[in-house]
Amino acid sequence: INFATLSKFFAETLAVAEHILLRPAFPEEELRTYCAKRKQRLTIDRTKVDVEAREAFARALFGPQHPYGTSYDEAEYDRLTRADVVEFHRRRYTAENCFVVCSGRIGERERQAIAALAERIPHGGATVPAAFPAPVTEHEAFVGHPGAVQSSLRIGRLLFPRQHPDFLGMQVVATALGGYFGSRLMRNLREEHGYTYGVVAAMVNFEREGYFAVATQVGTDVTRAALQAIYDEIERLRTEPMPAEELEIVKNMMTGEMMRILDGPFGIADVTIENILCGTDNASIGENIRRIRAMTPADVQRLAQRYLAREELVTAVAGAADPRQA
């Protein structure tokens, strides 16, 4: 739950926070309106190849029975009751399951008021982490969408969460591939071939898992060519050392983005929350910058060779025609 306010309205905002945390009403009519809107939004989203590819990619990575690979349908909103929401709040919104992050102009008076509210959050025992099944990965997935003029592509693989020592290095690899406008995939797919308006590559972090992914949308007629271009760029990172000048640009992009995010109370709060959830603190920011600056072309090639072998990649496509049959 996030609250942002001007300092002069701190007391009024804290009163609203207290009501939401300690005495939520969950009015039946408002709940039904919310569910109807979310159901309609989901119905609309399911008509888009981008959403279909994203869900197919998650199922392929983790398996349909894994929490990270499960997709819910519109009927779930019809089954949700006010009693379900009240019970979820009672079990999950407890002192053992929460922490408070404050940023901005927070004085001693404000800090004490926030601490007093936090102390009033009911105790209920820490939630026992759910048992996750082992991921069951399929390497290819296709979702047919008759009449679609574009195909949505996802290529990647299951790797590791942020706590892994190679996560940051793989962020450098992903940035070089598709993390900024002048990245390799942008130059290849957009500037050289005109297959797409944009392509992105990133490392994605969950609490218990993490993965590497490339995502883009292309014209149906160039689906196979675009897939091959992505495979080729990944393979080029594995077989050819990256020029030092290019790597320096990548490093500057990453460290500059980190500084931009930290420029202000909202970004500082977001980074702090992520660090707490990942079991670290803000002291890791400086260490991460140091590690990024220390990356060499050999490091990039080594990581690409270790983690991005073609046979390990998962490919998901949503569109009018299955590229495997073309």
Which residues are covered by each model-predicted region?
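Charge-rich, well-structured scaffold segments of protease-associated domains
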Residues: I1-A126, F160-P161, G169, E191-A326
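Short amphipathic alpha-helix segments
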Residues: R184-E192
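His/Glu-based metal-binding/catalytic segments typifying zinc-dependent metallopeptidases
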Residues: G125-S183, V317
